[in-house]
Amino acid sequence: MINGSIVALITPMNSDGSVDFASLERLVEFHIDQGTDAIVAVGTTGESATLPMNEHVTVVAQTVKFAAGRIPVIGGNGANATAEAIELTKSLSKVGVAAMLGVTPYYNKPTPKGLVAHYKAVAASTDIPQILYNVPGRTAVDMKPETVAELVSVSNIIGVKEATGDVSRVKRLRELCGNDFMLYSGDDATASEFLLLGGNGVISVANNIVPKAFKAMCDAALAGNAELAASIDEPLRGLYSTLFCEANPIPVKWAAHRMGLIECGHIRLPLTELSEQCHGLLLEAMTRAQIEVK
């Protein structure tokens, strides 16, 4: 099973808006070198909402190619139409992903019954392991632990990314879903506590720019060493808030560009590049986290 420190990878782009595959390859190598445990390709942070399906699949496939079996790649397969999610899932099943991460259908606000039917239909279209993804701040639907529990019996649904920031859900999910069901935090600010309470891993935005420290924090928390985890986490806490001073992934792409990790900080409309009033805040947080800016 995939656990530990997982990066919600940005999708680097050229100034004309095309995907920058050279920078993508460098990012994959960077995370392998820094010890990241797995990569999520084309999730929310990877701008899945603005990549058409053919491009989405290509970016995931290239990420798998660059990884070359050295690090697991999880492909984002979320959509707010079940038929579209199934089509995407079938395509991703052919490119070598280790698992897929499917966000709850957004905007159309399905009921719990609809969520269960959606995920069962998507899971039935593939043998690849599926990870549920609950992020109500973006989707306008909250998949409660009781709904997640209805999907545990589906053999290839292996876990959930829980991004509400409500760490009390760890205990409830464990009670309802059992010890073999994988629980991933999707909230950097509460990730350490999530792991200490029994979570298995973190799918992180900040991990894009502080992978070595984030990996060390995750390892400490998974080992039950709360004091060490807190000491590693403390210098990073400013990042956890300032990386959301504007909509993700605007700030993290700007930061990655300032670090020289990507050639260009371009982001696709309707998102725009980081506003100047956030530059100082983010630079200050990066300095505190001991990030070198070029």
From Swiss-Prot:
Molecular function terms, GO-annotated: 4-hydroxy-tetrahydrodipicolinate synthase activity
SUPFAM superfamilies in the record: Aldolase
Keyword Cytoplasm on entry: yes
Assigned keywords, A-Z: Amino-acid biosynthesis, Cytoplasm, Diaminopimelate biosynthesis, Lyase, Lysine biosynthesis, Schiff base
EC number: 4.3.3.7
Pfam assignment, any one: DHDPS
GO CC terms in record: cytosol
Reactions catalysed, as given in the entry: L-aspartate 4-semialdehyde + pyruvate = (2S,4S)-4-hydroxy-2,3,4,5-tetrahydrodipicolinate + H2O + H(+)
Pathway: Amino-acid biosynthesis; L-lysine biosynthesis via DAP pathway; (S)-tetrahydrodipicolinate from L-aspartate: step 3/4
Record keyword Lyase present: yes
Entry's localization field: Cytoplasm
Annotated residues for binding of pyruvate: 45, 203
GO biological process: diaminopimelate biosynthetic process; lysine biosynthetic process via diaminopimelate
Active-site residues, Swiss-Prot/TrEMBL: 133 (proton donor/acceptor), 161 (schiff-base intermediate with substrate)
Site (Part of a proton relay during catalysis): 44, 107
EC class name: lyase
UniProt xrefs under NCBIfam families: dapA
Subunit (UniProt): Homotetramer; dimer of dimers.
Function text: Catalyzes the condensation of (S)-aspartate-beta-semialdehyde [(S)-ASA] and pyruvate to 4-hydroxy-tetrahydrodipicolinate (HTPA).
Family: Belongs to the DapA family.
Protein name: 4-hydroxy-tetrahydrodipicolinate synthase
Species assigned in the record: Shewanella oneidensis (strain ATCC 700550 / JCM 31522 / CIP 106686 / LMG 19005 / NCIMB 14063 / MR-1)
Primary gene name: dapA
